[in-house]
Amino acid sequence: IDSEMMKVCLWASDYYEYPLGQVIFGALPSQVKRGIAIKDIKIFEDQYKRTSSKQMVVNLNDEQNSIFKKILRNIESFSTSLIYGITGSGKTEIYVKLAKEVIKKDKQVLIIVPEINLTPQTISRFKIYIDKNIQSYHSGQTLKRKMTTWLDVQNKKVDIIIGTRSSIFLPFKSLGLIIIDEEHDTSLK
């Protein structure tokens, strides 16, 4: 693992009072743990490959736009923001617009969802607006798929990752935004 991943693992080990070796072991794909060489893994194109060069434009209402601008002002520094709204209130549109701004700066975006079954619909929502490489990462994927995504993130071939908690351990090279959707969900604690 590289120095940035080691920093994340050291932090997680300290914060959760968990042995460093086990944190590192949990952060690595199983192929790496088993010593399978990267060259032995055939890399497939992602199932969520770009679909269209024509994307819809994100139109925010006044309240959404105000929230977007407030978060955008602080996006270059480490800061946290909470967007509170019921399902269907337009939080995703704000996320999309923030992600587009971050990607313009050649940064990657991580979107954490509480359940595996939310990844396909979240990917679909983002693909409507963003014509970039969007991939998922969660325990329901094959080992080959997870390793491919892990390598794509490491090689900065992915713009947006949508996944469950374990996706925080992906080896991002230029992470510019983390969105935790439904952060109140107990599966994210």
Q: Positions of the model-derived regions?
A:
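Accessory, non-ATPase domains that flank or precede helicase/AAA+ motor cores in DNA-metabolism machines
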Residues: I1-T164, I168-K189
